[in-house]
Each structure stands twice: as C-alpha cells, then as structure tokens.
Amino acid sequence: MPILYFGSYILIVCLVIVCDQLTKLWILHNFQLYEVREVIPDFFNLVYVVNTGAAFSMLADVDSPWRHYFFLFIGLGAVLGLTVYTYTLRKEHFLHMVGLACIVGGALGNLIDRVSYGYVVDFLDVYVGGYHWPAFNVADSAICVGVVLYMTMTLLAGNKEKKQK
C-alpha cells in the first residue's frame, strides 16, 4: 500500500478524532449535565448527557466493573482489526478506505472518552414530536457515515464485478 494512501487514512482518522473531541470539550465547558438548548424547534437540540453503555446505551444498566474493560477491549480490537484490514486494501478502493477511516476515527473518539471520563459524552438530540432518537455525538455520526459508505462501495464493487463477468 502506498504511503500517501495510508497517510490519507491516518489524516481522516485524526480529523474525525479532532472534530469529535473539540465538540465534546465545547459541550463540557458550556453545558451543565442534562442541560438542553433548542436549536431547531421540534427537531434538534443540543444536550449534555453521558453514556456508560455502548451504542444506544446498551449494557449501561449492567453493574459490573468489567463492563468498562469489555468496551475498551472491543473498541481497541475493532480499531486494530480495521486498520490492519485497511492496510491490505488496494488503492482503487479509496472510498472503502475513507469509510473505514471514519469508523476507526469515531471508535477512537469514543474510546478517548471512556479512558478519560469512564463514559461517552453525547450531545446531539434529534427528535420529531415526542419521539427522541438516542443522543449521539460526532464520533457516532462518523461511524454511521463510515458504515454506510463502506457498505455502499462494497455493493457497487460487487455489481461492477458481476457486470464484467
């Protein structure tokens, strides 16, 4: 894999981490825990909540000292596995790499929170009427965008290969 290609991967990972951590620091310095500020009425708020669980607060209610280490182990394993996999990609799979970099950057952003605070800082609250999507952050958004981009490019690559046969 060319250095420039993998350098792009590292750059995207770092950009995601910086954006994630800067937005979280802003929330931590400008909001009280559970404070809500309306941004777009009946659609979007900024909030300050903490998530001791995984995505959508899964396992947040499990009272075990091992839960923290479990999340760290899974997160680090995913980061290492995806980085090794990315290193094996051919350069024509650039958008696959971008998707994986977004996933890894998001995972590292949330891992930084877990190590620093023991929980993940969430602050984006999207809702319609009384239905609120669970609060999330820039790292979570990057992970979702990365998954969608990677899956889309994989499907398109599969269709391209079928047409060539």
From Swiss-Prot:
Family: Belongs to the peptidase A8 family.
Record-listed E.C. numbers: 3.4.23.36
Cellular component aspect of the GO annotation: plasma membrane
InterPro entries: Peptidase_A8
Protein name (database record): Lipoprotein signal peptidase
PROSITE patterns per the UniProt record, alphabetical: SPASE_II
Active-site residue list: D122, D140
Topology versus the membrane: Multi-pass membrane protein
Subcellular location: Cell inner membrane
Main localization (coarse): membrane
Leader sequence segment: none
Record function comment: This protein specifically catalyzes the removal of signal peptides from prolipoproteins.
Keyword terms: Aspartyl protease, Cell inner membrane, Cell membrane, Hydrolase, Membrane, Protease, Transmembrane, Transmembrane helix
Catalyzed reactions: Release of signal peptides from bacterial membrane prolipoproteins. Hydrolyzes -Xaa-Yaa-Zaa-|-(S,diacylglyceryl)Cys-, in which Xaa is hydrophobic (preferably Leu), and Yaa (Ala or Ser) and Zaa (Gly or Ala) have small, neutral side chains
Biological processes annotated in GO: proteolysis
UniProt cross-references to Pfam families, sorted A to Z: Peptidase_A8
TM region positions: 2-22, 39-59, 69-89, 92-112, 138-158
Metabolic or biological pathway: Protein modification; lipoprotein biosynthesis (signal peptide cleavage)
Domain of life: Bacteria
GO molecular function terms listed in the Swiss-Prot or TrEMBL record: aspartic-type endopeptidase activity
